[in-house]
Amino acid sequence: MFKKIIVFTSCFLVFACAGDNGKITYVEDLTTLKNTSSGQVIGFKHINNSTAWFGIPYAKPPINELRWRAPQPIEDSEKIIKATSFSDICFQNRSFVDYSEEKENYIGSEDCLYLNIHSPRNLSGNENLPVMVWIHGGGNTTGAGSGYDFSRLASEQKVIVITINYRLGPFGWFYHPSLIETTNSKEDKSGNYGLLDQILALKWVKKNIKEFGGNPNNVTIFGESAGGHNVFSLISSNLASGLFHRAISQ
């Protein structure tokens, strides 16, 4: 068992840069096919001598009867997923992330519980590389995993890097007595749906990352701003016990 290490940084150098949330689709590469609990995912050869899989679902869409409920894992599936473009970002206020004069005040979708994986290129799946899971900032009201390009970090430092989406704003952190009348689940009643999303994403990583050449027993979570606060919440949560081994908070 690795000892958890908390690192505080004022200058956070991760060799990453902000990306684009647009629907760019990359050319699939069948040699990147991986079997996961979400299905058979096909990625692509990315920049900086890396391989990537974008838009892999790690939970059922949190809509309708699953809105304001703990996220539900996807049952083992054999469907083929072309993981060559980012998913929709989670529902959020446009003004915080996009200052263009559009009619709509909000962007994104409730169907947003997806993750993205960056790895060094041409791995066999037996490398047992360290794993890093990025938790984005944005006051828990804005942001997305697709806003960061970790291809260089993955290829140069020989690590597997995952970025995740989690529910934001009132969809991620909201409590009202009328919402819990029909459930006996403590998690459903907590109102901490965004944090529960992060925990389920970490469970997905633990279950599936070995297929991508990662070591499920060497996982570091790292985040900045609200993501950094979420790192501390994950450290203190019994529900996240055993899902990661090191932590970095900015």
Model segments located where?
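Sec-dependent N-terminal signal peptides
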Residues: 5-14
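Non-catalytic accessory segments of hydrolases
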Residues: 17-192, 216
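Alpha/beta-hydrolase active-site loop
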Residues: 112, 186-211
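Active-site loop->helix "elbow" adjoining a glycine-rich segment at hydrolase catalytic centers
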Residues: 137-138, 193-197, 225-228
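Alpha/beta-hydrolase fold nucleophile elbow
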Residues: 205, 212-224
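Short glycine-enriched nucleophile-adjacent loop
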Residues: 228-240
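A conserved short beta-strand
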Residues: 241-250
